[in-house]
């Protein structure tokens, strides 16, 4: 039976609508607490402890209180980190040897959405069987622990400072950032106090933007999903580089002094090239079905195997573990470097990119010279609910014709949305006109067959 609530990145939705309601989140905390209390990892007679962090959405206060109440009712102690990037919660959970970590965030979504995601004691996302066990407990009545068995809650002292020191520890001790002017866009999100300190303490001249959260402006015209604000700030301040994080700081985009934007695909190539220079070789790297073909070709030219995972950092992580590799990324800016952190971390990834540039003495444009991204055309086609697009001969014929015309110099990717009756048609080609033409032809075939 499929999962009812957990998606690829926890539970997410619009605040006030199921399942992101205070009563459900209280029961979720209770259910998760009961699963943790029954875990073999909890020593006999001891009480599990979980860490809760959140981003800056106004609803975070309500959901934090609901989670805290649920955990307490299950007999689980709670530590409150306050505003904390998702990767910060993962790190602190592992470093403090806690039973689990919980993040209240909807990442890059607008303020009226929110979500809950969990980390295991080792700082990784929960395995599927644990999520299934939590869902099973949601169906059971809530039976509050006796008064002498209730969980307690307290604030974690200097949570931000601990995470800042961890981030700095991933940057080579032989380097610093003196002489660099950096614009840091924190998306009015969880890293608004943390990220500027990290780069400043390493010596950079930091110009922070997106650091005035009011509960309603997270990701609003700023951050990794709205990089125009960063481009303008870099140009206006004559900065060397700009770094944009999203609301929970697990992804990034980078802008150079000219205002050119670099996505996760390109940054993955930069990091792989750096590892080749320092370690002699890189066995392989992981991208997704959406990774630009030019990056795959460039990595293979360097002798690096490349594997495509399904879209989602969870699936990139699965492939990295399966192959025993370290580096993976999504074009959206989720970058995994498993010898540095157990999860995607926008701040740490930015530091890795800066270290790579320091070591090479080159700019991003110079490192990526010869890697020209193929133009992509994405068309979202709305279908009738339940339409059988896979069984359509006309759609199959349009796809086959496009693939034959591209003949290895491009790609066709057809992917159904997991949340709405939409088919995503993406074509990648060396020439933009070819990508547009083939995408529109396939989209027309989809419309004719499914609407």
Curated annotation (Swiss-Prot):
Gene that this polypeptide is encoded by: glmM
Molecular functions (GO terms): magnesium ion binding; phosphoglucosamine mutase activity; phosphomannomutase activity
CC cofactor: Mg(2+)
PANTHER family given in the database record: PHOSPHOGLUCOMUTASE (ALPHA-D-GLUCOSE-1,6-BISPHOSPHATE-DEPENDENT) (PTHR42946:SF1), PHOSPHOHEXOSE MUTASE (PTHR42946)
Family to which this protein belongs: Belongs to the phosphohexose mutase family.
InterPro entries: A-D-PHexomutase_a/b/a-I (IPR005844), A-D-PHexomutase_a/b/a-I/II/III (IPR016055), A-D-PHexomutase_a/b/a-II (IPR005845), A-D-PHexomutase_a/b/a-III (IPR005846), A-D-PHexomutase_C (IPR005843), A-D-PHexomutase_C_sf (IPR036900), A-D-PHexomutase_CS (IPR016066), Alpha-D-phosphohexomutase_SF (IPR005841)
Protein name per the record: Phosphoglucosamine mutase
Lineage: Bacteria, Pseudomonadati, Pseudomonadota, Betaproteobacteria, Burkholderiales
Cofactor note: Binds 1 Mg(2+) ion per subunit.
Signal peptide extent: none
EC number(s) reported in the record: 5.4.2.10
Entry annotation: catalytic residues: 107
CDD domains: GlmM
Keyword terms, alphabetized: Isomerase, Magnesium, Metal-binding, Phosphoprotein
Post-translational modification: Activated by phosphorylation.
A Gene Ontology BP annotation from the UniProt entry: carbohydrate metabolic process
PROSITE patterns named among the record's database cross-references: PGM_PMM (PS00710)
Binding site for Mg(2+): 107, 246, 248, 250
């Amino acid at each position: 039976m499929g999962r009812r609530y957990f998606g690829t990145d926890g539970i997410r939705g619009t605040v006030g609508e199921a399942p992101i309601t205070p009563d459900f989140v209280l029961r979720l905390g209770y259910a998760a607490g009961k699963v943790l209390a029954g875990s073999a990892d909890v020593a006999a007679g001891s009480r599990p402890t979980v860490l809760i962090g959140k981003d800056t959405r106004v609803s975070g206060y309500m959901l934090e209180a609901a989670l805290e109440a649920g955990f307490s009712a299950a007999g689980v102690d709670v530590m409150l980190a306050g505003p904390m990037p998702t990767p910060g919660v993962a790190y602190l959970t592992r470093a403090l040897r806690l039973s689990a970590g919980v993040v209240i965030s909807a990442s890059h979504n607008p303020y009226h959405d929110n979500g809950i995601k969990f980390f295991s004691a080792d700082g990784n996302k929960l395995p599927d069987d644990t999520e299934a066990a939590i869902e099973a407990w949601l169906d059971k009545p809530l039976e509050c622990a006796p008064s002498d068995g209730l969980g307690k809650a307290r604030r974690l002292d200097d949570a931000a400072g601990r995470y800042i020191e961890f981030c700095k520890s991933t940057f080579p001790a032989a380097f610093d950032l003196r002489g660099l002017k950096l614009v840091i866009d924190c998306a009015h999100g969880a890293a608004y106090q943390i990220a500027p300190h990290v780069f400043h303490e390493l010596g950079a001249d930091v110009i922070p933007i997106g650091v005035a959260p009011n509960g309603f402006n997270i990701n609003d015209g700023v951050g990794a999903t709205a990089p125009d604000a960063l481009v303008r700030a870099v140009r206006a301040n004559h900065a060397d580089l700009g770094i944009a994080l999203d609301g929970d700081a697990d992804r990034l985009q980078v802008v150079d002094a000219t205002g050119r934007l670099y996505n996760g695909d390109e940054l993955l190539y930069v990091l792989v090239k750096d590892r080749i220079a320092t370690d002699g070789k890189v066995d392989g790297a992981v991208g997704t079905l959406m990774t630009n073909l030019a990056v795959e070709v460039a990595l293979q030219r360097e002798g690096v195997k490349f594997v495509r995972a399904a879209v989602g950092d969870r699936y990139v992580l699965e492939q990295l573990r399966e192959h025993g590799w370290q580096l993976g990324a999504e074009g959206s800016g989720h970058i995994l470097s498993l010898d540095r952190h157990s999860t995607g971390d926008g701040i740490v990834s930015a530091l890795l990119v800066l270290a790579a540039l320091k070591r090479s003495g080159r700019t991003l444009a110079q490192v990526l010279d010869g890697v020209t991204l193929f133009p992509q055309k994405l068309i979202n086609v709305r279908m009738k609910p339940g339409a059988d697009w896979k069984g359509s001969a006309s759609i199959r014929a349009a796809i086959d014709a496009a693939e034959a015309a591209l003949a290895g110099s491009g790609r066709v990717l057809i992917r159904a949305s997991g949340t709405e009756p939409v088919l995503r048609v993406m074509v990648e080609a060396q020439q933009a006109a070819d990508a547009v033409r083939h995408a529109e032809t396939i989209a027309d075939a989809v419309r004719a067959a499914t609407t």
